[in-house]
Amino acid sequence: MMERFPRLAQRVLSVPFTPKYLKSCKKTNPLTSHLMQLRGSQRPIFIQWNLQGRPSVCTDLISKKNYSSATARAGWFLGLGEKKKQAMPDIVKAGDPVLHEPSQDIPLEEIGSERIQKIIEEMVKVMRNAPGVGLAAPQIGIPLKIIVLEDTNEYISYAPKDETKAQDRRPFGLLVIINPKLKKKGNKTALFFEGCLSVDGFRAVVERHLEVEVTGLDRNGKAIKVDASGWQARILQHEYDHLDGTLYVDKMAPRTFRTVENLDLPLAAGCPKLGVC
């Protein structure tokens, strides 16, 4: 099954495979012959903001800035005890062309196939292992229209209550959306710091709509619709952008891009104020 992936791509996706892309897929694609070991020292990435412009909470990854090995050993995110290395795809980093390629729709008849289900399983594993609240297929080197996301009470409990209230951040269970279509609702937007698993170590302010409607198919090929607001709406927009080949840095507010270490510093004069517009 692993060796058949190039033929799957030719038959289903009609995606041109450049040598560079094939090299990337060899390292990241769950349907190639070898799965790479995720580096145990990989540092979590997270999205943070508050109304005073000080960092604290994330969207693409849920983690604390000072992520200690002690908390990791305690299994504080997943309750699974000590984290162990697992064979799974690496997260593709900014600079790889796959992150700027429009993703391909998946034919309905292919959704239930072992190949597509394997991709979904790997995406969920990678997202939770990060740990994170969202992931798009291009982030593991696969230009297909699949996104996965979830936010839990446990994740949210690590953020101050006043901030999660300001974010309108509420838990939701695992969502797998195939061939999603996103519609922005209303005119209200908000400006928050945002980060990405594929842009390690950096953050920037991004304006997002407060309410969206997403339609698509679940992992069984059944039609679904998600009406989201607040933090969940932001996560959906972030992941949906990945399917169009867009990173948050392509939408960031000017002069707000910075390293994680500099998140405590105030924004430059003239930068937009954080919060609901």
From Swiss-Prot:
Binds 1 Zn(2+) ion per subunit. It catalyses: N-terminal N-formyl-L-methionyl-[peptide] + H2O = N-terminal L-methionyl-[peptide] + formate. Its main location: plastid. Its EC number is 3.5.1.88. PANTHER family: PEPTIDE DEFORMYLASE, PEPTIDE DEFORMYLASE, MITOCHONDRIAL. This is Peptide deformylase 1A, chloroplastic. NCBIfam families: pept_deformyl, PRK00150.1-3. One of its GO terms (molecular function) is peptide deformylase activity. CDD domains: Pep_deformylase. It is found in: Plastid, Chloroplast stroma. It comes from Solanum lycopersicum.
